[in-house]
């Protein structure tokens, strides 16, 4: 007898949140610097007052580099404040800086890239032989962005070392203040004038006039292949998904949001709006649950049911609407377990909206890289599993009135499959719709955004829009009513014959 997939335990949910503190670059920097400073304090005579004063002096820099990421190309500007700090305070204790660098290499390459991935998803103990190269290419918003994190924590340790070693630390207050104010002004100007690649947001709320008078579908099923890079899907041996594309409507320039992090993207997909409104701005969610109405809320008010079958991180955004699975599973079998359990959950709950998140492609990109054969192999496996799930739905008779959507929440970059800052491979995601109410063989070339997912589900199921939805309904994918009625009748007649 097959074992059903475990739900995410309470421990896993808490552990996932703790891991995000170290995984998200914004929170990692102050935590890492504080940890290194504490170890330095332990081996240098326990100068308690100097230790705490050093941390107090660092608070403005902690805040500045939490607010301002210096994403992608902007990260090279981080070396300028570091150079100024060395000019102001002199060459610091090189032992401290070398220790910090060594611990960072240990954390990224060996703890995260090897031990963590081996224990959680079963990668080889020799993963460090590849992943160190991937970290050097990485440009995402995590702690694994070497050339973003390195100048940040070195700058802060230069300041800490100067204060800690000073005979009169208070005498350095003016220099630290000048550096902090200068760093803030510099960061503000760099981001204000050079950070210009964020997706353009829809300025107005979705027009309710775009909703059809009657529901177009009885059910909507959304399969999210987490972290599936668009061009790699097109290159992969994925015959079923490629057939769905030919027989449905494909959006060639479907754009994710910024920052392109999983919880942030899912929040935008199913509320129809942006992080500034729904409140989920990274995978590290300090204030739980989206702050606006989601498609799940809308369905519940109308006596319908929506379920998101996903990883524990998504509970932080959608709470009880999430049926969670454990992400602690060998990567070669995790998607198979997910799709087997998806059938059980769908059969038991009979939802009007069913969303399932597949994670093996994303995890392979993170642990082994997106430009290697393993990534294409995982897409091939996802294709077979989705084909099996689709056939199962068809055998139940559900596909006669179901809209079937396949998409990714974000792509993945060339390093450790990074995503967040919208580097090459992250920005545009695969997105296509299939079903009796969906146009066949159509390609939409115009820019669209994943914030259109929730409004489009509203249109398909005949329910109101979420209250802050901004994405336009993807109505160009819908067949005209007369065409749909004729083709449905022909389809049913053919089945009888």
Predicted regions and their residues:
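Metal-dependent active-site segment of extracytoplasmic phospho-/sulfohydrolases and closely related
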Residues: 221-224, 228, 240, 381-423, ...
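Active-site-proximal alpha/beta segments of enzymes that process anionic O-linked groups
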Residues: 105-137, 216-217, 227-350, 453-455, ...
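N-terminal signal-anchor transmembrane helix
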Residues: 197-218
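Phosphate/adenylate-binding glycine loop and adjacent helical scaffold
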Residues: 482-497
